[in-house]
A protein has these predicted regions:
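Short, surface-exposed coil-to-beta transition loops
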Residues: 56-64, 85-91, 96, 186-190, ...
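Gly/Pro-enriched, hydrophobic low-complexity segments
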Residues: 160, 164-233
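Positively charged n-region of N-terminal signal peptides that target proteins for export
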Residues: 1-8
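Beta-turn initiation residues at beta-strand->coil junctions
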Residues: 45-49, 79-83, 102-106, 206-212
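An acidic-aromatic
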Residues: 67-128
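Extended lipid/amphipathic-ligand handling interfaces
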Residues: 30-34, 63-70, 92, 96-99, ...
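N-terminal leader/targeting segments and the immediate start of mature chains
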Residues: 6, 15-70, 74, 229-233
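Flexible, processing/modification-adjacent segments and terminal tails
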Residues: 105-165
Length: 233
């Protein structure tokens, strides 16, 4: 009798283990599908490039946060631009194919505007620019072994593992997007997708790239939350 009970328990363990594995794979496919189909959200983006020369350093970049819609591309955000160790507050808008920038320079308000490139190729387009949204990275969701999985209630976080093979995959995706060469750079990354297993929706996308070489270092961070929220510009 005891052997029969142990046999049943072992069988249930195998079945439940299989279900759990399938559940993880299913969630990863939902994440991939949702990421490809994301329509809008609250985007936060930051780029900081520091160059050191003759005992001095120069910071160039920006940080921005606001609501964004992707098709057609529309944006309403605010933040700062950094240049030559000075920072300028900015407001950014994209509407009807035109990019508007409001900046405060030397206590004066200055407006600029320019057309958005064909195909919505714009530095503030999260869906186009974020490493987490590139095809080569999204395809890594097809293999659950690429991801560390943590659960907090209904929230499931998938974090891309740190291996030499995956680092090369991230490099390849970034080089394909930017055409920059990274052979001589120290390179690190964070890529996460947060999924709600109850609503079966992706809740947040996070990525960070760090690369540096002698005399320069660059950090790129971005995130998207409140995914598919209504956005009015």
């Amino acid at each position: 009798m005891r052997k029969q009970i142990l046999g049943v328990m072992l069988g249930l363990s195998v079945v439940l283990s299989g279900c759990s594995s399938q559940s993880t794979e299913s969630m990863l496919q939902e994440v991939k599908k949702d990421a490809k189909e994301v329509k809008s959200g609250k985007a936060t983006m930051m780029l900081s490039s520091i160059k050191e020369n003759n005992n001095s350093s120069r910071n160039l970049g920006f940080e921005i946060s606001g609501d964004e819609k992707f098709d057609p591309l529309e944006l309403k955000a605010s933040g700062k631009t950094f240049h030559s160790n000075k920072s300028y507050e900015t407001e950014d808008y994209i509407k009807d194919g035109v990019y508007y920038i409001k900046s405060n320079i030397d206590s004066k308000t200055v407006w600029y505007k320019r057309k958005v490139p064909v195909g919505n190729k714009h530095i503030l387009n999260f869906k186009d620019q974020s490493i987490s949204m590139q095809e080569g990275i999204l395809n890594l969701l097809d293999n659950k072994d690429n991801w560390d999985v943590t659960k907090d209630g209904d929230k499931v976080t998938f974090k891309l593992k740190k291996t030499d093979e995956l680092k090369n995959k991230v490099k390849e995706a970034y080089i394909k997007k930017t055409t920059w060469k990274l052979e001589n750079y120290d390179f690190d990354y964070i890529i996460e997708y947060i999924y709600n297993s109850k609503t079966k929706d992706i809740e947040k996308i996070v990525s960070e790239l760090n690369y540096k070489t002698s005399g320069s270092s660059t950090i790129i961070k971005d995130s998207l939350e409140e995914i598919n929220k209504e956005v009015k510009v």
